């Protein structure tokens, strides 16, 4: 299950990359800089820079939730690991664009209706064109990017529904 993220190299990836709202992707890919600028500022980064901007209802993520994220990224190695999620995107983009072999593994694309959920049909079509034979889509209502925090019951139900496919 892929939850509310665009996939590098899978359409509409070029559109996603060009979206100025997603400036943080390039920032996080920059070696060493985000770690230095964000160290000690994780709470403000998560509360104002991330959750306030990318949730349908920023109050769905409490200060206690933010504190949990802050603790998870408190150590320099943890903060670096968080940035490393973004750094292979260029290589992933190249790989995914070149992928044409059949892929029979079931894929469930799910996204928040106020975030990447609107791109899900185009992503599914692109995956099918690239050889993925079993793609299912779901749009999670009243949710932004942080679908697990915003709609935990719905996400749990989706996982239970699709876990056996």
Predicted regions and their residues:
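Flexible "cap/lid" subdomain of the alpha/beta-hydrolase fold that forms the substrate-access gate
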Residues: 1-139, 156, 160, 164
């Amino acid at each position: 299950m892929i939850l509310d993220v665009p996939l590098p190299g899978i359409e509409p990836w070029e559109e996603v990359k060009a979206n100025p709202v997603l400036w943080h992707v390039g920032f996080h890919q920059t070696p060493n800089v985000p770690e230095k600028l964000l160290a000690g500022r994780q709470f403000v980064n998560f509360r104002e820079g991330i959750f306030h901007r990318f949730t349908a209802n920023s109050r769905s993520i409490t200060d206690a939730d933010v504190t949990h994220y802050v603790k998870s990224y408190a150590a320099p190695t943890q903060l670096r690991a968080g940035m490393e999620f973004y750094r292979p995107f260029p290589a992933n983009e190249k790989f995914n664009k070149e992928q044409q072999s059949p892929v029979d593994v079931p894929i469930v694309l799910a996204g928040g209706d106020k975030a990447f959920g609107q791109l899900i049909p185009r992503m599914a079509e692109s995956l099918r064109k690239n050889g993925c034979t079993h793609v299912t889509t779901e749009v999670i209502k009243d949710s932004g990017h942080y679908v697990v925090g915003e709609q935990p019951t719905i996400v749990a139900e989706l996982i239970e529904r699709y876990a056996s496919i």
